[in-house]
């Protein structure tokens, strides 16, 4: 209750301050200096692209080869684990398993942190920049990223901590510390764990909450016809209360919500995409031909060649499915199992759902829409359609509106659901990282929730 009151007072204070100066501007001014420093270190470029993309994709390819394509060999097994087919086999003689949630709940929680507005706006941006060929490389990156998820989530379960009350604490903070200690690099492990925890907390405040809340507020204001910062603050207040009620109950309540919301929102979006694709059945073959052709022989304006399109697709996929980021292993660590690798198998389904399925669906809708020549591929990420500039989610919305009357209501619902689910998961990631740094007591718990 104290947490909820604090959240309300904070947001009311922000809404009052926003009358003097825009809230977005205040936040930008406060965090810009620190953000610039971190961006320069983390996203330094090599050949015009962030080095972290080379690292993530290279690691994914390495794990795929070393483990002999687990993304393909164990795909069916992963589905069976999620279905609970092997639950009896996972029981020990004492008939007990550490953990707090089921395989499906852990998967739903992790997927809710990755399937977000990037699947709507990010894909549109990638296609606008690199053309249809970017879709091919997104799919490739998603497929090999499955192997990375397999590795990091197996480690998350293997090195997790379980307290006397059965509460689980896991993620990169723990497997970096324990794993590197086993190999004689104890100090390096501790430093790496602290750096990850700090970055994860920052991510939970920024991209995990603030950015998602902001995007949801924008689409709701547009739909309702409001154009004030105060309206955005009130929408943020409602979202904060909703998310706060959920996360205050811990991983069990989070999992019970995500196991219902994630399948619903994913199915809703996929069905809408399938309706549009099915309504244009004759274009499907041409769309896939264009995706493959443009992947190796791009014609988008301003695209330098195959490597440029490849990097655009890889960049979008890597940041969409978060393979290699380590965040998903925090959710998967809470699973009820005595076999770490079983949850690694479950985790490899995430990039497939996020990138290979949902991102590809969005891409096909946009590509089919543009067979009419609505806009030119390439440029700075924005496209002109009938003399109006569209960017990100606006491109996707325009494509949907062409085939589904009143689609703004559907897309607004999708964006809000995606945003809320991402906020829920990333709040959990943040609080787990916070507890690693400042202890697992009630005070540390309340301080984070107050700040979030």
Question: What are these model-derived regions, one by one?
Answer:
Residues 63-64, 112, 141-166, 177-214, ...:
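Helix-loop-helix module between adjacent transmembrane segments
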Residues 141-152, 235-251, 262-282, 315-316, ...:
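Selective recognition of specific alpha-helical transmembrane segments in multi-pass small-molecule
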Residues 152-160, 164-165, 272-290, 298, ...:
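Extracellular/periplasmic helix-exit of transmembrane alpha-helices
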Residues 55, 63-80, 192, 196, ...:
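Membrane-interface loop-to-helix entry segments
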Residues 184-188, 192, 412-452:
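C-terminal membrane-solvent junction of multi-pass transporters and transport-like membrane proteins
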Residues 71-101, 125-127, 131, 135, ...:
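Flexible loop linkers connecting adjacent transmembrane helices
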Residues 90-127, 155-179, 195-201, 305-352:
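Alpha-helical membrane segments and immediately flanking helix-loop junctions
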Residues 2-113, 117, 128-134, 145:
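N-terminal alpha-helical transmembrane segments of multi-pass membrane transport
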């Amino acid at each position: 209750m104290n947490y909820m009151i604090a959240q309300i007072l904070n947001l009311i204070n922000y809404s009052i301050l926003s009358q003097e100066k825009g809230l977005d501007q205040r936040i930008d001014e406060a965090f810009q200096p620190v953000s610039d420093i971190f961006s320069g270190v983390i996203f330094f470029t090599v050949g015009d692209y962030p080095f972290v993309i080379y690292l993530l994709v290279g690691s994914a390819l390495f794990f795929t080869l070393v483990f002999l394509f687990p993304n393909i060999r164990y795909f069916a097994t992963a589905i069976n684990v999620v279905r609970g087919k092997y639950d009896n086999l996972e029981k020990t003689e004492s008939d007990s398993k550490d953990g707090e949630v089921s395989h499906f709940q852990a998967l739903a929680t992790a997927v809710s942190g990755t399937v977000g507005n990037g699947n709507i706006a990010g894909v549109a941006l990638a296609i606008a920049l690199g053309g249809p060929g970017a879709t091919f490389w997104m799919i490739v990156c998603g497929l090999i990223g499955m192997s990375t998820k397999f590795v990091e989530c197996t480690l998350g379960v293997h090195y997790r901590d379980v307290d006397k009350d059965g509460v689980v604490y896991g993620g990169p903070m723990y497997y970096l510390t324990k794993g590197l200690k086993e190999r004689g690099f104890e100090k390096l492990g501790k430093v790496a764990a602290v750096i990850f925890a700090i970055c994860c907390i920052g991510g939970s405040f920024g991209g995990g909450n603030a950015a998602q809340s902001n995007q949801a507020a924008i689409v709701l204001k547009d739909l309702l016809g409001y154009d004030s910062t105060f309206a955005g603050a009130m929408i943020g207040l409602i979202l904060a209360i909703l998310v706060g009620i959920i996360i205050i109950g811990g991983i069990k309540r989070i999992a019970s919500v995500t196991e219902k919301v994630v399948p619903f929102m994913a199915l809703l979006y996929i069905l809408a995409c399938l309706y549009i694709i099915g309504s244009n059945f004759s274009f499907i073959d041409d769309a896939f031909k264009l995706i493959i052709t443009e992947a190796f022989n791009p014609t988008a304006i301003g695209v330098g060649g195959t490597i440029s399109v490849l990097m655009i697709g890889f960049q979008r996929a890597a940041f969409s499915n978060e393979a290699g980021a380590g965040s998903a292993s925090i959710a998967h660590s809470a699973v009820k199992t005595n076999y770490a690798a079983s949850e690694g198998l479950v985790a490899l389904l995430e990039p497939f759902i996020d990138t290979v399925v949902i991102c590809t669906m969005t891409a096909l809708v946009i590509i089919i829409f543009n067979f009419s020549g609505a806009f030119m591929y390439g440029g700075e990420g924005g496209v002109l359609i009938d003399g109006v500039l569209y960017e990100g989610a606006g491109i996707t919305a325009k494509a949907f509106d062409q085939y589904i009357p009143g689609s703004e209501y559907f897309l607004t619902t999708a964006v809000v659901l995606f945003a809320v689910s991402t906020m829920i998961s990333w709040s959990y990631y943040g609080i787990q990282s916070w507890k690693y740094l400042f202890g697992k007591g009630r005070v540390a718990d309340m301080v984070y929730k107050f700040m979030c």
